[in-house]
Curated annotation (Swiss-Prot):
UniProt function note: The RuvA-RuvB-RuvC complex processes Holliday junction (HJ) DNA during genetic recombination and DNA repair, while the RuvA-RuvB complex plays an important role in the rescue of blocked DNA replication forks via replication fork reversal (RFR). RuvA specifically binds to HJ cruciform DNA, conferring on it an open structure. The RuvB hexamer acts as an ATP-dependent pump, pulling dsDNA into and through the RuvAB complex. HJ branch migration allows RuvC to scan DNA until it finds its consensus sequence, where it cleaves and resolves the cruciform DNA.
GO terms of biological process kind: DNA recombination; DNA repair
Gene3D superfamilies: 5' to 3' exonuclease, C-terminal subdomain (1.10.150.20), DNA helicase RuvA subunit, C-terminal domain (1.10.8.10), Nucleic acid-binding proteins (2.40.50.140)
One Pfam family from the record: RuvA_N
Intracellular or extracellular location(s): Cytoplasm
Organism: Rickettsia typhi (strain ATCC VR-144 / Wilmington)
Protein name, per record: Holliday junction branch migration complex subunit RuvA
GO molecular-function term, one example from the UniProt record: four-way junction DNA binding
Length: 200
């Protein structure tokens, strides 16, 4: 599975780019927002979401982890696939989506082609709790740290994958950052694992 590509933008089309990585060209689909920021001939790092199907392998690229997270989050809504998720992200930033859902602003989604009343209702209903759960804890921790909320959420997810419960990961991260607000992401993970092992 490909998680990241660093290379030069070789060419660009309406919904994808070809990124040259050491002489190999990868076709990467992206949102209109991301495509608008990419310039042919320049080097970029793209975070990649790989979709493997029987008939194809598709790569989806993002300049930020937050956009990648929202790409996956949107697809958790019944009726939203990769194309619709990219369409939404071509019109709205992750911040726009968070604010709209928190404020119950349905009109912002209805303005997007292909998003009708029923899909808008599902987006509001199915994502409201998920967004609150994912971002509330990291936003609270962010207030006392130089690490972004998205990075904190990635650390929490990494710790969960390493055996922590989500509650345990959140509390551990918050405790470490409170003691050292300038800690790096790598050190944050190492310290969390060290503290957990020493408690057994």
């Amino acid at each position: 599975m490909i998680g990241k590509l660093s290379g030069k933008i070789d060419s660009q089309c309406d919904d994808y780019v070809i990124i040259d990585v050491n002489g190999v060209g990868y076709l990467v689909y992206a949102s209109g927002t991301t495509l608008a920021k990419l310039v042919e001939g320049r080097f970029y790092k793209l975070f990649i979401e790989t979709h493997v199907r029987e008939e194809h392998i598709h790569l989806y690229g993002f300049l930020t982890l937050e956009e990648k997270n929202f790409f996956n989050l949107l697809q958790s809504v019944n009726g939203i696939g990769t194309k619709m998720a990219l369409s939404i992200l071509s019109n709205l930033t992750p911040t726009d989506i968070k604010i709209a859902i928190n404020n119950d602003d349905k009109n912002i989604f209805k303005a997007i082609s292909g998003v009708g009343d029923k899909l808008t209702e599902r987006i509001m209903l199915e994502l409201k709790g998920k967004i609150a759960k994912i971002f509330s804890s990291s936003a609270i921790i962010k207030d006392s740290s130089n690490i972004s909320s998205v990075e904190i959420n990635e650390v929490i997810k990494a710790l969960v994958n390493l055996g922590f419960t989500r509650f345990e990961a959140q509390n551990t991260v918050q405790g470490i950052i409170t003691q050292n607000t300038k800690i790096s992401i790598d050190e944050l993970i190492k310290t969390a694992l060290k503290n957990r092992n020493s408690s057994f």
